[in-house]
Amino acid sequence: MRPSSSCWTAPIQATRGEIYDASGITLASTSVVWTIWADPSYSSILYTSQTAADGTVTKTLDPAMCAEVSRELTLRLLSGDGESLDAVDTSSDAYQQQYQTVYDALSKTDAAYVTLATKVNNAVKLSIEQYVTAFNKAHKKATDTSRKGRISVSSEKSFQRNYPYGAFAAAVLGFTDADGVGTYGLEKSYQSTLAGVDGRTITQRNAVGNAIADANATTFAAKDGSNLVLSLDVNVQEIVERYLNEAIAANTVENRGTAIVMNVKTGAILAMASKPDFDPNDPLDYSANLDYLNELVRAEPELYGIYKKDADGNEIKDENGNRILDEEADYSGYFRDIQWKNKAITELYYPGSVFKVITSAMGIDSGLANINTTFTCAGAYGVAKETYHCAGHKAHGTITLAEALRQSCNIYYIQLGQRIGSQTFYDYFDAFGFTSRTGVDLPSETNFMQYYKADQLGEVQLASSAFGQAMAITPLQMCTAVAAAVNGGYLVTPHVVDKITDSNGNVIEEVGANVRRQVISASTSDAIRQIMEYEVGNGTGGGKYAYVSGYRIGGKSGTSEQLNMDRRTDGDYKKVASFAAVLPADDPEIIVYVMLDDPNNAKTDYSSLLAAPVVGNIISEVAPYLGIATDGEDRSGTTVTVPNLVGTEWSSAQVQLNIKGLKHQLAESESSQTAAAVTYQYPHAGAKVAYGTTVYLYTDTYEGQHTEVPDVTGKSADFARQMLSAAGLNCVVEGDANGTVQAQSEDAGASVQRGSIITITCG
């Protein structure tokens, strides 16, 4: 009689789609890895067995044999390639830990399945298979019965998500869990797109589980996941992350910072960063940020405090009735949550004076004001029982709207808000997108909004709202609103994914500009662009530290008080420093936005000195990379005098160079400190150099580094310039710039200071 049979189904796992930047660089990929497991109960060589009269089998481990097998397996697991066994350091902690894991697993002689290692590459897996095959063959023929038997070691295929650039763009990309399911970021919001559909193979098997030879198997192929091609550009992202990190370190920013570069017309996000962040390859690890996170949770007890409790769960208080922080509490959950958050969309902040751009648009578009409308600022202004002041209690006198934005006059904007009125103010506030989420294609955008509706906007609420100190919004909401104010008046939906492709690269779906509505007229938008450019000026306006020579830039700073937070140790409110810049100012393509939450710079709280320089530095590299239109002035042949930057803080030194049309580079050294003062520069102060020359700055040495001059003869002028730049040298071209290099001012191989000017003669 034929044994009974049944259908068995074996899954075929789909390969998760990849994530690419705008130029096709891989940001997230999937590789095949293997779980190595063993069946000790079937590994007869690891033990001796005795059967009692009642049929009970007793197994006794052979420690020596178990140790031998464990050693061989461990060497292969740690070799990396399955071959370099001699290179494995058997005295290392890694070896000892892996060896103990294998030995303990193999010692479980009654177990049918024990895991020896996970995420093993194919080369190591093959090496282990070869070892097991050879071992079993040799011991099958052994004449010594104590050496006769077999080991049962097998492998299971799985997939591993890889992020080749580590923490790069981590808050945007997110990560997957142990099962390969998107848990945060794009990995989560596009889970179904990336995951694909698993397949399966159905076979008939007999009663003992063996496949029936003459039965046909039915296979349903897996459908691999689709790929995401982002609007995010790795070069722009790198620039943004670098300068944001510098700013956080230089200004002792307590509660992280965020930066965004976005196309104002389409909403395409070119860069989005939140720092400090995490490595999505190991998202549970917060050790790299431990000191920072420890300081943060203790500096923000109203947000993260874990307080001491008695045995009944009641909070313990000191003699003054204050709760007592539990210094021994486990903050790991907070640590991970903080570093995972995309600060641009998950947290609210008071925008401060950046919001004056929006109030200006309200006044102009409603017909209640224009750029020449005047109000008088006496330095203080009473509303109901509240008295408002401008920064430093300064009286600006009678000023126009354009001048009020440049001077960031609170008193002017309170009066403008009063003229606009509660209902009109709220209607525009709503139209600019502040009462709803932006709709960005990222998860965890906060649903919580903090603002006053029209019937809640009393005198005081309206006054505070007019200069951005009564509503809490997200940084991305502020970005999209400013974009609408300058792009002709259109509120667009921001997005990170540009298109979706299949596994063969064919485009399945493209994401274009999604205009939600027109908020203001084109003429109003034109007026806003004018007054924002007036704010930055040619390095002379209130936002002058965001100016980069050669570009028309509009901007606005915002220094807001965190009224909902505990005060600082000096008794003042914690601050948020932010700056939004658009360029080119006459027809903006991008917005560059930076926000620093609770900076603790000993010299200033003003965002014009804290956030504006970061924006300027980002623009100094991003604008030429993206090919943003310049101001049209021909500066070729222009000579610039290098300023004296020694003794100047790194961030301030950068600003001075940006304004003069010179580039800056922090010279590489082991202890470079961006928060420190410049100790050495080259070219030196007073040197006459060409417009666009790079000045190399040092913060930890009084001597410049040297570099070797490359041989550029015979190269095109452009290629020669690139070679010299890569070597840390400046270049001046003489002769026919379309020709090839005939001579160079320094011999190839010569050792010169970084930043030296090499003149090449072309013909």
How would you name each of these model-derived features?
Residues S6, P11-T15, D198, T252-R256, ...:
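Short, small/polar residue-rich loop motifs at catalytic or cofactor-binding pockets
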Residues A28, W34, N206-F220, K265-V354, ...:
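Beta-lactam-recognizing serine transpeptidase/beta-lactamase-like catalytic domain environment
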